[in-house]
Each structure stands twice: as structure tokens, then as C-alpha cells.
From Swiss-Prot:
It catalyses: 2-formamido-N(1)-(5-O-phospho-beta-D-ribosyl)acetamidine + ATP = 5-amino-1-(5-phospho-beta-D-ribosyl)imidazole + ADP + phosphate + H(+). PANTHER family: TRIFUNCTIONAL PURINE BIOSYNTHETIC PROTEIN ADENOSINE-3 (PTHR10520:SF12), TRIFUNCTIONAL PURINE BIOSYNTHETIC PROTEIN ADENOSINE-3-RELATED (PTHR10520). InterPro entries: PurM-like_C_dom, PurM-like_C_sf, PurM-like_N, PurM-like_N_sf, PurM_cligase. One of its GO terms (biological process) is adenine biosynthetic process. Coiled coil: none annotated. NCBIfam families: purM (TIGR00878). This is Phosphoribosylformylglycinamidine cyclo-ligase.
């Protein structure tokens, strides 16, 4: 017998009206990220963006990323307002280490049932991250997919395109022995290592909202947005000859610094040059995590490392400090012996 009931998309769990409400909610914050190169507004099948005219040989640089299981912690604590900043930061920080200026950003927000308030909060954070990095939020996809996600769970991904002058690409090829390494301080764990963070919280039976570190909750420390270094780094690049920049993300010191080192080069890090922020000391103690594993999983307070000629190091620290960064000389580049590690951290 045929079912005569008339079904709609909403009956199947997809509320088009809610999606339209979300677009109306976010239009204002998205408009605040606009760049002069952007042509048109939200709603087109694709976003149009011209290249800035100041570039003679523009090279496009693209990247995509997520925020890992930091999102799970944010959902568990019902804090959705800063995860969008994390999303933008993870993408634009990867672009700027190559000397690229971020141009535009797109996001993907997927959920089983669209909660307009939650989605608007996340996308408002994305817009804030775009403002901090000077790139335009030109579009995105909101996917409501019944049966694909549990409860109120959602996932986010970001996509960014930037531009760099061909002759000014930073790829590490200029790194030489004697270069000094300058560190830029991190705001917290950023968006890496959160599966280990959550495991530590679980095995130590810790409620992050009821645990205090240096005057604020552990939850606040853990959900502190990833620092966006774009404006500080672009300003530095304009003024000094930068040989390489490493963004310390998944893989920590051991895996990210070698990505920008030529064969035969070694980064020698002076561990005594800085003190780990309290959140990392807490994680190491609560999880009984080895020193090697800490440096493999977390940034341990260092968000980026810049390599440049020794005679420019003091000026770099001065310029970065003036840009609002915590910056210091963290090590040097040396010639590596055959078979030696590319990163040495001296206690």
C-alpha cells in the first residue's frame, strides 16, 4: 500500500529556512572582513577575487586545515565563540610562513541538525580570525546531514588562499650555519595535541572548569584561541631578510622545524631561553608525559620560529615585540654531522 503522506526536506531533517536564517545572521560580520579585491557578496555560486596590483609576479599559496579534537573539548564545554578563530589561524599561519599575504578564506560547517545560534557563533569567530589576519571571508558551505553526526556535534574545516611575490617566497633555502632562531610566543596549546589533552583530563579525572591555573580556569587556558601571527610576520618580512619560518603545529619541535631546514642543517634550541607556560607544565605532570613527547606533541609555548642572519636577530626581537609579540632568541643553526638529528634541544 502506497504511503499518501506528502514528505518534505524538513521532514527528512534538513531545514532550509534555518540555513537561510543563518546566512542573514552572519552577513554583517562577514561584510566586515571585505577586501577591495573581492568582487560581489555572499550568495553567488563562486566567489570572485582579483589579485592585488602591487605584485609583479604573484604566486598563489593555498592551504586547508581543521582544529582537531580541540573542537570536541569546545563542544563538551559548550564554548563555540572562539573555535572559528582557531580555524582561521591554523590556515593563515601556514601561509604566512612562506611569505604569503592571506587574501580570502572559505569555511565548511557540517552538522546533523543545524543549530543557528551555535553556527552563527562559530562563523562569527571565523570572521574575527579573518579580520585579525586581513583576509576576506568570501563564502562557505553549511551542510546539515541527518544521521551523519551524533546529537549537537558538528565539524569545521577552513580553506585559505594567499599571494606572495615570486622573488620573495620564503622556503628555507637561504638558511645557513650561524643563523639565529627567534621564537614567537604561543597563546596556549593552539590547536594541536588535544587528543592527548583530553586523555590527560580523563585519566586524571580533572574538570577543566573547576581547576585553576594562574588565576584562570584550565578550560580557559585550553580553549585560548590560536594566535594569529600574520600581521607581525608580514611586517617583519618587509623590514628584514628572513631565511625561514616554521609554524609549530602537529609534530611539535621535532617535525616542524626540519620542514624548513636544508639538508645538512641543524637547529640547536636552548631550552633555558624560555619557561613553559603553566598549562604545559600541568599537562606534563598530570599525564606523566615525557619531555620528548611534550616537544613532539605540543608547541610548549612557542608558536613560530624564525631563522635569520645573526646580525639581524636583536632587531627582529625588537620589531616583533613592538608588534605585540612575545619574542626571544631561542637557538642557532649549525652544521649537522651525518646521521644527526635536525633538531637538538639542549636543557
Amino acid at each position: 500500500m502506497t504511503n499518501k503522506t506528502s514528505l518534505s526536506y524538513k521532514d527528512a531533517g534538513v531545514d532550509i529556512d534555518a540555513g537561510n536564517d543563518l546566512v542573514d545572521r552572519i552577513k554583517g560580520v562577514v561584510k566586515q572582513t571585505r577586501r577591495p579585491e573581492v568582487m560581489g557578496g555572499l550568495g553567488g555560486f563562486g566567489a570572485l577575487c582579483a589579485l592585488p596590483q602591487k605584485y609583479r609576479e604573484p604566486i598563489l599559496v593555498s592551504g586547508t586545515d581543521g582544529v582537531g579534537t580541540k573542537l570536541r573539548l569546545a563542544m563538551d564545554l559548550k564554548r563555540h565563540d572562539t573555535i572559528g578563530i582557531d580555524l582561521v589561524a591554523m590556515c593563515v599561519n601556514d601561509l604566512v610562513v612562506q611569505g604569503a599575504e592571506p587574501l580570502f578564506f572559505l569555511d565548511y560547517f557540517a552538522t546533523g541538525k543545524l543549530d543557528v545560534d551555535t553556527a552563527a557563533s562559530v562563523i562569527t569567530g571565523i570572521a574575527e580570525g579573518c579580520k585579525q589576519s586581513g583576509c576576506a571571508l568570501v563564502g562557505g558551505e553549511t551542510a546539515e546531514m541527518p544521521g551523519m553526526y551524533h546529537g549537537d556535534d558538528y565539524d569545521v574545516a577552513g580553506f585559505c588562499v594567499g599571494v606572495v611575490e615570486k622573488s620573495e617566497i620564503i622556503d628555507g633555502s637561504k638558511v645557513t650555519p650561524g643563523d639565529v632562531l627567534v621564537a614567537l610566543g604561543a597563546s596556549g596549546p593552539h590547536s594541536n595535541g588535544y587528543s592527548l589533552v583530553r586523555k590527560i583530563l580523563d585519566v586524571s579525572n580533572t574538570n577543566p572548569e573547576q581547576t585553576s591555573l594562574e588565576g584562570k580556569s584550565l578550560a580557559d587556558h585550553l580553549l585560548e584561541p590560536t594566535k594569529i601571527y600574520v600581521k607581525s610576520i608580514l611586517s617583519l618580512i618587509e623590514q628584514l631578510d628572513i631565511h625561514a619560518i616554521a609554524h609549530l603545529t602537529g609534530g611539535g619541535f621535532w617535525e616542524n622545524i626540519p620542514r624548513v631546514l636544508p639538508q645538512g642543517m641543524q637547529a640547536v634550541i636552548d631550552e633555558a631561553s624560555w619557561q613553559w607556560p603553566a598549562v604545559f607544565s600541568w599537562l606534563q605532570h598530570a599525564g606523566n608525559v615525557s619531555r620528548h613527547e611534550m616537544y613532539r606533541t605540543f608547541n610548549c609555548g612557542v608558536g613560530m620560529v624564525v631563522a635569520l642572519p645573526a646580525e639581524l636577530a636583536d632587531k627582529a626581537v625588537e620589531l616583533l615585540t613592538a608588534s605585540g609579540e612575545k619574542a626571544w632568541k631561542i637557538g642557532v643553526i649549525a652544521t649537522a654531522t651525518e646521521g644527526a638529528e635536525q633538531v637538538i634541544i639542549n636543557p
